[in-house]
UniProtKB/Swiss-Prot annotation:
The keyword Membrane applies. Mg(2+) binds at E198. Its main location: mitochondrion. It comes from Drosophila narragansett. This is Cytochrome c oxidase subunit 2.
Amino acid sequence: MSTWANLGLQDSASPLMEQLIFFHDHALLILVMITVLVGYLMFMLFFNSYVNRFLLHGQLIEMIWTILPAIILLFIAMPSLRLLYLLDEINEPSITLKSIGHQWYWSYEYSDFNNIEFDSYMIPTNELANDGFRLLDVDNRIILPMNSQIRILVTAADVIHSWTVPALGVKVDGTPGRLNQTNFFINRPGLFYGQCSEICGANHSFMPIVIESVPVNYFIKWISNSVNS
């Protein structure tokens, strides 16, 4: 989750988020190099005493500043396209989770099991435990196994919502009448926080998402207890 004075992205908890962070750093490095080069050229232009009154055109320099940006854009576009295809790929999921956005809470259904569904509301500040996170903790967490391919189906019951968990690199719009899907793979246990990322009304800020990633054997026990109860 985000912490105070954190200038970077959240620590990744999935392979896709690691790839997104690598691409961010790759693009940022190129932007810094361009900024330094342009700044240096502007500095040299403003603070030198050389004047060429007879310079009308320069085919060489024009060719350079046309071809060089095209090459730079290719270095950005190729990894970006690779990531787009990776993010859109569904790899034989072990578990399917369905998320339904409401004003202003989330409903969840475990489609592979019978009668496992619940609503997830934000815990109000006056009911929050001393070790809880304000505006982020919920009464019912999503329990998911680590090291398993997970598919999530997202829709909405009223207005457009967006199911977002930054540490997993997941952001899926929930649109009424439409079922969107994506997949993710959690590679470590822990709690991962997210929020609705589409303005959906007065209480848009009070729709947190909490995923609890656990080992597979603990997940099976939780499923068994939920089915029996």
